[in-house]
Amino acid sequence: ETRPDNPFPGLTTHAYLWTAANALFYSPATDAEFDQLSDLGGVTHHYLSHRDEAGPMLKGIARQFGSTLRAPLAELDDIAEHHRVDVPLGSRHVDSNGVEVIPTPGHTPGSTCYLVPGAEGRYLFTGDTVIRTPDGDWWAGYLDGMSDRHTLAESLRLLATLSPDVVISSAFLGDTAVHRVEPG
């Protein structure tokens, strides 16, 4: 987990390194933790959940680590303004790193979630498609004027079938973006 960034009052973001594949999920706001990422093995693969994670750090990460950028095909133009996308992601599949790529449009047209195996079960990286509120409720990432309500509802129905053990969002309200999911 990288240092927090606060793009809006009350909203916090992090990026997360999955060391099993040296895969970075989301994007850090600064290069302040590049040394720590290097100490953990670096970044070989960089996964974005949607266009809002694209920014100046994409070039910095690629330059520092030689990483492969994987990002939603539906938002390729927006993301490519910051750095070229090496692997456009448009369909549900398990990639060569063991990451299940799950397109979940609705928050944005290209919103994508990722399901990975981990030490404590299955980890679902949801981007901003689903986040936890400070009072413990789940919030669907619907934003007037940007999101598609019906498409997001379909994506949420899909996510409900996955049964992850841990959910990790890119943005969050409250203390943490990492939440263990209790069975039932």
What are the language-model segments listed below?
Residues E1-F8, N22-F25, T30, S67, ...:
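Metallo-beta-lactamase
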Residues A20-A21, S96:
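Residue-level signal for tight coil/turn positions that link beta-strands
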Residues H14-L17:
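Short, surface-exposed beta-strand/loop micro-motifs that present aromatic residues
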